[in-house]
A protein has these predicted regions:
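Non-catalytic structural scaffold of enzyme domains
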Residues: 1-196
Length: 196
């Protein structure tokens, strides 16, 4: 298969670490070949403070311009594996190609699971924007987030800390014991904690 015949997938994010983690996961999956074009535009304001209301610097203008670059480069779909996923509708409108967040990719996979209750372990910004809650409604899923003490523990999980995987596994077990059928990790940092 010639490179021009392969799917071209843009990978867009404000957080280079999230893009790197996403690319590692795609590589580990193997499967069909696709051309992946990662782009993390310079000087994009951090999405987290903006989504939490702690900053007035909107990341959307730079992200919109980057999505347009990816579409102009031949990408037929764009994945957004970080907090910037909350802007997928606006990015799709700007780029003219589908722009998918982690929520858009994960939640349809959970339809039909037991009682369809899912707990989302994510950053404070994703939680504040209720990115998963809004998407879950489209699929008839009940989406929840950990309570404040558990959310605070999530902030302590770092890939470089030896205890992080154990803490994260305990949080997952707690969320399952609370009646959730599934637990979704929506953070490059949380996913990387399992890699060490």
């Amino acid at each position: 298969m010639q490179i021009q015949d392969q799917p071209h997938i843009g990978v867009l994010g404000a957080d280079p670490a999230a893009i790197t983690q996403f690319l590692r996961r795609v590589q580990a999956l193997g499967g069909e070949h696709a051309v992946l074009l990662p782009l993390s535009p310079a000087a994009v304001p951090d999405c987290e403070p903006y989504l939490c209301g702690a900053s007035t610097q909107p990341p959307l203008p730079k992200l919109r311009a980057a999505a347009e670059v990816l579409a102009a480069s031949g990408c037929t779909v764009i994945a957004v594996p970080d907090s910037a996923g909350i802007f997928c509708e606006q990015l799709t409108a700007a780029a003219g190609v589908p722009v998918l967040s982690t929520a858009d990719a994960v939640l349809p996979q959970l339809v039909g699971a037991l009682h369809q209750r899912v707990s989302i372990l994510c950053t404070p910004g994703v939680r504040a924007a209720n990115a998963y809650g809004l998407t879950a409604q489209r699929y008839g899923l009940h989406c929840g987030y950990p309570d404040a003490p558990v959310q605070a523990l999530l902030g302590c999980v770092r890939p470089e800390k030896a205890c992080s995987e154990q803490v994260l596994r305990s949080i997952i077990e707690l969320e399952l014991a609370r009646g959730n059928d599934s637990v979704v990790l929506d953070s490059a940092q949380l996913c990387a904690a399992f890699a060490h």
